Design a protein with these regions (language model features):
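Conserved functional hotspot residues or short segments at active or partner-binding sites
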Residues: 1-157
Length: 157
């Protein structure tokens, strides 16, 4: 069967599943073995439980809204040092090269998880999507430029 899209009146063909107009590959180049081992051994959870136990009252006072959190919260290098210590306690061997590769991705993930614990799951994605989700960023780019460039965006991919 053939269908026409509502907005651009493009013809799309049914019968076999959904094929995206634009393919965007996820960037996994910053996911290191060290990071993967930390996640697998529960280090993120250990860190987050300790961090939230220690700082929840301060965080609640300082960031009463997600907007205040997004504007002012930064997970410091000292905070990340606590993560490395938690990894050592879980027998996850430190790897400097892997840490350098994954450090900022880890910082973003932990920031998103802290936002989730303070507010809701929605805020996890409000942190992660604009920073780390390539398909999300590409979709926003296409939608924001749609009126000016329309179908050319899709045809040019």
């Amino acid at each position: 069967p053939e269908y026409r899209t509502l907005r651009s009146r493009r013809t799309v063909h049914g019968g076999g599943g959904i094929q995206p107009d634009v393919r965007v590959e996820s960037d996994t180049t910053r996911v290191s073995g060290y990071m993967t081992r930390m996640v697998a051994q529960g280090v993120y959870n250990d860190f987050l439980m300790e961090y939230m136990d220690r700082y929840r009252t301060l965080l609640d006072e300082r960031y009463p809204t997600y907007e205040a959190f997004a504007e002012g919260f930064t997970l410091s290098d000292d905070d990340l040092g606590l993560l490395i210590r938690a990894a050592k306690e879980r027998k996850v061997e430190y790897n400097e090269e892997d840490w350098t590769l994954s450090k900022e991705l880890i910082r973003t993930q932990l920031t998103a998880m802290i936002a989730q614990r303070l507010f809701s799951t929605t805020e996890f994605y409000r942190v992660m999507n604009p920073r780390e989700n390539e398909p999300y960023k590409k979709a926003l780019e296409i939608l924001h430029a749609w009126n000016e460039q329309g179908e050319q965006i899709l045809l040019g991919q």
